[in-house]
């Protein structure tokens, strides 16, 4: 059982530690990578020995960050996880599980955090883990350099859909302003993160939209990508992250579901909602989690079974919110 700690306690733990291993979640996104990069640079500034480990390869779109990857050259004495809500989200590669099982400190913003770490610094009100990691680093006595600022801005911007998602608050904008003042190259970062699409990404998007289906009086829209389609398009996994916003962006749709088949045949399902519909309610009942407007889960089996399982939970949530008659099957 984890012990919840405040920011000052987390700062004391980080300042008192050395030989620190920073863990990201699998299928890494901008927030987990941005946190890892910013924390690594902060620890380096304090003279600490630190490195980063992830179960999956970091997408090339984030290669502007200064990251030191763990190569086994030291024995970690302190393990910190960033933006990882549950032990299952670490993945199985690169010996990550053996380190994740002994996570000393988790820094996270998911309300669904399972409490796997010995101590957890949790801020579910933050739109991104990078949003409040900024204050952690400042309290560590580290100056926010342009390099650290770039990492933090990456996490804040990507987890808010470039400040479009409902999770964005005045505090989010203030954190973004602070990292801009510290030297984050916002113009270049936004262009790289949001305004560039590869040919492979466009091909994958076309395939996904060709699979579009509607359910529950068009309140729910579903798109799917099989592993064969992902492979044939040549698209990198990170390029598909913002694909999850497409079905929800359709006029009149309250729930958008994106199914992405993984190499092992299982499906990674992203849930995006609006209004009173809680995406986390849907995902949690399927063993996943996340936020009110953005959540996800993984389901084994064929696509039809995966669709049925998630759509059943969507139906219950729509009925709970009074958007669907109770007798609608």
PLM region spans:
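Short, motif-level signal for alpha-helix interfacial/capping segments enriched in acidic residues
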Residues: 5-9, 85, 137-139
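A generic local secondary-structure boundary/capping motif
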Residues: 68-70, 93-96, 120-123, 141-143, ...
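Hydrophobic/aromatic beta-strand patches that form the interior of the parallel beta-sheet core
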Residues: 53, 80, 103-107, 119-122, ...
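Active-site cofactor/cluster-binding pocket
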Residues: 63-119
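Hydrophobic helix-and-loop "lid/oligomerization" segment in the mid-to-C-terminal part
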Residues: 2-61, 70-76, 158-285, 290-329
